[in-house]
Amino acid sequence: FLKAGKDILHITLSSGISGVINSAMIAKENLEERYPDRKILIVDSLGASSGYGLLMDKLADLRDEGKSLDEVFRYAEKHRLNVHHWFFSTDLTFYVKGGRISKTAGAIGGVLNICPLLNMDNQGRLIPRYKIRTKRKVIRTIVDKMAEYADHQTDYNGKCYISHSECYEDARAVADLVESRFPY
């Protein structure tokens, strides 16, 4: 791109969960020496997964609308925290294997059907927020959180990405509840 006279806007995975921004900054420094007339802009998305994808989708829309590189960069910097990421799990196995919870807590949590609800904080770190009993309640809580962050509690005119890891039925349950709460 730089060789062809094009500038670069690079959006990284959240620095709160990955060191990729450090590599991007090193690459930027090296490339700026070789291409001093080109512009290389880097944004820490402070996001991951579908939230990262949602931001990228919006930035692509802005590009397609003819916005300049600087305008897209400023939008990303200003609005990256407007994307809300909420995650839950019904399986505590990997929390135990990763050392986040003890084997005892994992066993008890499994028996009690505890579903941890996590989100990304303003530094892009994955933070456990709630321990909710049952999948049905955690799904309802995710959609309640969406309403909490939406304008006027039910006015949601943006896009919503729902992803899953081999849990289609759970994702469908979230989607159904979103569609009932936020008619479009």
Explain the meaning of each model-derived region.
Residues G16-V20, A24-E29, Y35-L41, G47-D57, ...:
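Mixed-charge interfacial surface used for oligomerization/domain docking
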Residues F1-I21:
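N-terminal glycine-rich phosphate/adenylate-binding segment common to multiple enzyme folds
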